[in-house]
Amino acid sequence: MDDLSGKVAVVTGGAAGIGRGIVEALLEEGVRVVIADVEASVLDDTLKGLHPLGQVRGVVTDVSSAASVEALADDVFATEGACHLLFNNAGVTSGGGGRPWEQEPNDWTWCFSVNVFGVANGMLSFVPRMIESGLPGVVVNTSSMDGGIAPVPYASVYASSKAAISCLTEALAHQLSAACTQLRAAVFYPSGGLLDTGLWTAQRNRPPELARLKPRPPAPGTTFAEFKAQLEAAGRSVDVVDLLELGRFVVRGVKAGDFIIGHGLEEAGAMLHARADAIAEGRLPPAALS
């Protein structure tokens, strides 16, 4: 898919962070973009800033709700006539800390409802219609190096959800190919440095019915600014990712036909080799640290 001009894209979680970077990069390519986001006020503010850049509109959507995503698909196909690019990008953290035994059921439900079921809902509502259209298209699911490649121990639930996305996307890609469709799938691993996204404060959108029964006090380093300051105080070099450049990187990967889109894949490959060696020998794989 070399020329994206005039194509229609849907980006979930597109009002801020990585999603907004992808949206801006798509607009640069002449793509008509529909942003799906759960935060109406943030979505409105984002649209005001993006309207001068191209054809873009928003639909308030809760990706954890199958009905909400189905309504989004109804809107897109009725209004735009097609969907060529679907970016299942919305994501959250569990908010329960790192130790698996300290996570509450609501932590698991909250994280998986957005990160896993959000992707599944997008697939279920859009992919059959995209196949039926007979048009070339791409489904891009946002995973993470944390879980998608190797789990970081202090983010156990989040890592588990991202591992699920990687497995689902790989299965989707094989099935789309076997069915001889015009669609393909790709998995995106955001990387390249420290990411200043809404993931740091994702708990602001957590539904009351999924609140923790035992609230946790904010831990040091739980915001982007705090974590960045901690790294700098420890003498570590901090590279903050330009989210628009990251969005452009994703779009280039889509145009190139890549299945895996991400920086630092050689390093990830070395990590996977170490994991594979450990698994082959029956050992616990080495912990990934970020």
For each feature predicted by the language model, list its residue ranges.
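SDR active-site lid
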Residues: 177-261
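The beta1-alpha1 cofactor-binding region of Rossmann-like NAD(H)/NADP(H)-dependent oxidoreductases
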Residues: 40-41, 59-71, 105, 142
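Canonical Rossmann dinucleotide-binding motif of NAD(H)/NADP(H)-dependent dehydrogenases/reductases
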Residues: 2-34
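Catalytic loop of short-chain dehydrogenase/reductase
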Residues: 140-164, 169-170, 174-178, 191-194, ...
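Substrate-binding pocket helix/loop in short-chain dehydrogenase/reductase
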Residues: 97-100, 104-109
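Active-site loop of short-chain dehydrogenase/reductase
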Residues: 7, 55, 82-83, 130-143, ...
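Conserved amphipathic alpha-helix within the SDR
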Residues: 51, 57-60, 66-81, 126
